[in-house]
């Protein structure tokens, strides 16, 4: 697999006043094309640190892609320093001078003399046209290395990468780009450490297959990349790995690639023809919001009750006063009565209820912040799940709602 290092230049990136979205975009696009990013560096507008970054990156990877530092001002040093490291002499490119002059003429503005530095390039470099700004990019192949320089503004950088750089990568690295396959497996249930233990030894240790675990909003995404001798070999490696993971994780697998927990639950409900209603306390309507985020949810979603107070639980869900007084609002007993009451009020096949303590206040030694009870009712069947979530108020609410959806998914997948 071909490798790349990314360099982002700009003091504003180091100070944290600007997010480095360019590196995220580039790493994603490169991996999709079978090029592995093995390093990323963020440097300020300092000649020495920029020089060290390019020297180090060129020593590590097959290609180096830089964004930023191609403007006309004194602190725009990227191109000059990178070309010094590559041992290339820069000369004025008259075609670029003409383009810059036309750019300013169309805007009825005189071209500052400082902009001429943007027309300096090594004679052997391919100049990358920038229709959205004054800073052109550069693509240079030398000594089995590729140097790519792109402007810092994300809109300009992304346009140039998609329309100019990717065609050159396909030209220069056709074998790398055409033999890689990728798959994302989405998991809910085991945590990252537990999942790593489960998967230990499941996939053969091979340089042709890589696996990474990524935590995403309560889920764990397993990112698989197969880089075999050719595309067929890569597909075989991927199929074998996916089958091994499926056997190890079973129902913990929510879906693959573009699948979402909600889309999988929606498909299960559509297949069974069942309708659902939800009763929420600590999530404050978030579960209902998640369900209705998907177009067409009226086919299977009856509605919801947000019963935040004890009075609302009694009035709208028929939760008994004695149950609340004896066990408290956050209890498996109340979760059951909420689900049963919601099912009775709506007449639906299924009902979900959530009651808990999202924090930051309200917790006790016996019932700490993060304690949540979720109940699923299906006819006479009742299942209560006790969860202990860790995080702030928002994350606890999100985890509670997603766990409720996952409880429903597992029930429907098991024939419920």
From Swiss-Prot:
Chain segments annotated as coiled-coil in the UniProt record: none
Superkingdom classification of source: Bacteria
SMART domains named in the record: MoCF_biosynth (SM00852)
Family assignment from sequence similarity: Belongs to the CinA family.
HAMAP family: CinA_B (MF_00226_B)
NCBIfam families linked: cinA_nterm, PncC_domain, PRK00549.1
Protein name: CinA-like protein
